[in-house]
């Protein structure tokens, strides 16, 4: 019970779809502010996993008494080819305050990204592209950079002396 939201019951429903998939629905009814649904979906494969949280609501925001809002936080991970770890994360919101106000997420910015990483005994590869969404009222053009791509390569090798080791690094960044 809260003076802002009133009485807030939350009812979870859990469904196992099969051996590798499940979903959970959490319904929220805010006595004074509307209703929300949080859906968590998970799925596994041999070398991959997917997990998504989807938020939908018709709640009071600072802009409107009952505004239809939504957000997603999805993550896909996989190990492909010759030991490449792939991660893709999508985090977006249709409105800048409802995630914090209704305690779904406390962040003031959301970062979506795709990365590929490979680690060998003497080499390291990393590639990333990302996009930021600002959840503040400040100038969004400076707080929402898109980085495509960021590439980092590192190689280690023996030096000229017995205990010496050489490391070469190459890094490139595109804003």
Q: Where does each model-flagged region fall?
A:
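Outer-membrane beta-barrel proteins and related beta-barrel translocases across Gram-negative bacteria
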Residues: 1-175
